[in-house]
Amino acid sequence: MSRVANFTSSSIHKLMSKGRGNWSLENVGAPFKSYVQEKIYEARTGVPMNKDISARPAIWGWFMEQWVFENKMGLDYSLVSKKRYKHPDLAWSGMPDTLLEDSVGDIKNPYTLLSFCKKVDSLESLESFKSLTPEYYWQLVSNAILAEKEYAEIFIHVPYEDELADIREFTELYDGDQNKVAWINWATDDELPHILKDHYYKDLNHIRFKVPEEDKELLTERVKMATELLNKAI
């Protein structure tokens, strides 16, 4: 199943943007409009406007997702990051990283420590998570809808310095393009994101919450609007 001409969970926060004034369903922002236009172009060409990113931050995120799952997640979790869920009626799909019986989850591995610290600080409450990290929040809401789960959770991770040697060895076991992760094996410690133990931040940070029904409904309505605009244009 392709993501071409589908509004995807990873970018769905753009559809929740607002224009000037208070938020309302009709008051869409510039990111909403540009994202819809991007999907119109994809529908007209049959190819994605933004192909898989080969930059190191993206590669690090994909690679570490598998490492975190195999080394730091409980046995109850299933890694499903290669399975795409599709809405039955709308141009809408998503790929959560993890599943439990009642929840979807995502594993995030920021490439910069500044980003890591900011993202972890946003987990102080559900309200701060939603306002400070909307791209993560709405991705979880979207995946919860598509996978029909009541709860959502996110894991924000950075390795400890003494884990970097094991991470380099893991490149040989990586279930993906070995050429893309080869640089991790020869990178110095200073070139890889990491923190030290016994300081303020810990390696794996987590929040789990019941997805508000109101937010499910609002997001669904915005995707309906976007799908209608897409269908009219093609």
Residue ranges and their predicted role:
Residues 14, 74, 78, 191, ...:
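Acidic/proline-rich low-complexity IDRs
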Residues 51, 59-89:
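An N-terminal domain-cap segment
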Residues 76-96, 100-222:
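Nucleic-acid nuclease catalytic cores
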Residues 218-234:
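Charged phosphate-binding loop/patch that engages nucleotide di/tri-phosphates or the phosphate backbone
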Residues 51-64, 106, 196-203:
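Short N-terminal secondary-structure initiator segments
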Residues 1-63, 71, 123-130, 161-163, ...:
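Charged, glycine-rich intrinsically disordered N-terminal tails and low-complexity linkers that flank
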